[in-house]
Amino acid sequence: MKEKDIYFQKLNELISNAYVPYSNFRVSCLLLTDGGWFAGVNIENSAYSPTICAERSAVSSMITSGFKQIFKVYILTDTIVKDIGTPCGVCRQVLSEFAKPETPIITYNLKGEKFFYTLEQLLPFAFNKDALK
C-alpha cells in the first residue's frame, strides 16, 4: 500500500471521532514522534474558546505519554477545497515547541489530495525558547 493510502486511511478513520456539533468541521491529526504515533481530533465546546484542535489534541497525548519530539505531522480536514487544511496559528506555535523548522506537515482533503509544507513555511517567524534568553 502506498504511504499516502496508509496515512489517509488512518486519518479518515479517526476523523469520525471529532466532536464538532457547532461547526461540523472535522479534523484529524497523526504525529510521528520519538515515541511512535499519536492521534488527535478536534473537540468543540459551546463556549468556543475551550475548543481543542486536532493537532493540540495529538500533542497533548504525546506529552502525556512522555515524549517530546515530532518528526512528521499528517492532517485531514473534511473539506474538498484545495489547501484549506493547514494548522491554525495557535497549533503552528504549539507544534514549533516540539518540532524542528524543517519538520514536514502533510495535509489531505477528503478527495485524498495531498499537500506538503514544512513547519517553517507555515510559521516563518516562530516565537521559541531562544527568544526568552
From Swiss-Prot:
Pfam families per the UniProt record, alphabetical: dCMP_cyt_deam_1
Keywords: Hydrolase, Metal-binding, Zinc
Gene Ontology annotations for the cellular component aspect, listed alphabetically: cytosol
GO biological process: cytidine deamination
Entry's cofactor comment: Binds 1 zinc ion.
GO MF annotations in UniProt: cytidine deaminase activity; identical protein binding; zinc ion binding
Catalytic activity: cytidine + H2O + H(+) = uridine + NH4(+); 2'-deoxycytidine + H2O + H(+) = 2'-deoxyuridine + NH4(+)
Cofactor(s) listed in the protein's UniProt record: Zn(2+)
Residues annotated as catalytic: 55
EC top class, as a word: hydrolase
EC number: 3.5.4.5
Binding site for substrate: 42-44
Record-listed Zn(2+) binding positions: 53, 88, 91
CMP/dCMP-type deaminase domain mapped to chain residues: 2-130
Function: This enzyme scavenges exogenous and endogenous cytidine and 2'-deoxycytidine for UMP synthesis.
Subunit architecture: Homodimer.
Similarity section: Belongs to the cytidine and deoxycytidylate deaminase family.
PANTHER family given in the database record: CYTIDINE DEAMINASE
Protein's name in the database: Cytidine deaminase
Organism: Mycoplasmoides pirum (Mycoplasma pirum)
